[in-house]
Amino acid sequence: VQLMNDKLGVFRHQKIGAQYAYKPQLLGGTLSLGVQVSLLMESLDGTQLDAGQGNDPALPTTQVTGNGVDFALGAYYMRGNLYVGLSAQHLTSPVITLGDKYELPISPTYYLTGGYNIKLRNPFVTIKPSALLRTDGSSYRADVTTRVVYTHEKRVLYAGLGYSPTISVTGMIGGSFHGIIIGYSYEMYTSAIK
């Protein structure tokens, strides 16, 4: 089960999803093939928008909400300390109707990731550098991230930094508590939001 709550400016993106993965052994490693079905809930707080003088009919003046069904697929392969993954979200290209007259089209997004887990002399600490490339077919974004992960007797804590060239720097912390993974990240933009 996946729960997500993300706020960016006047938008709030929420998702609840169910996932399933099949994990066969392949070439000395593990291949994970996954599928996800989700309910997307989107809202836009029009009371926070400044349309300047007069009213712009293209912008709502109240809070508007809508929802839609979404579908995703992914494949992930891990062998030893090396991993690589490929996935696609929003394969149904949902169009969320916000209120009575506003539409939010959501394009499919494709991801390619890879990384390596570096074991240190301290058996409880691992450094995990990784890279992520994502595209919706018209634009792309690349991120490089390094996390330091502490693992001991089912306890997992992590902290890390991420960098997206010309876009942002991200800090993150989190851990596993009673089998539930909880994390927080903050992204600081280094250029104007596009």
Model-derived segments and spans:
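Subset of outer-membrane beta-barrel
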Residues: 1-194
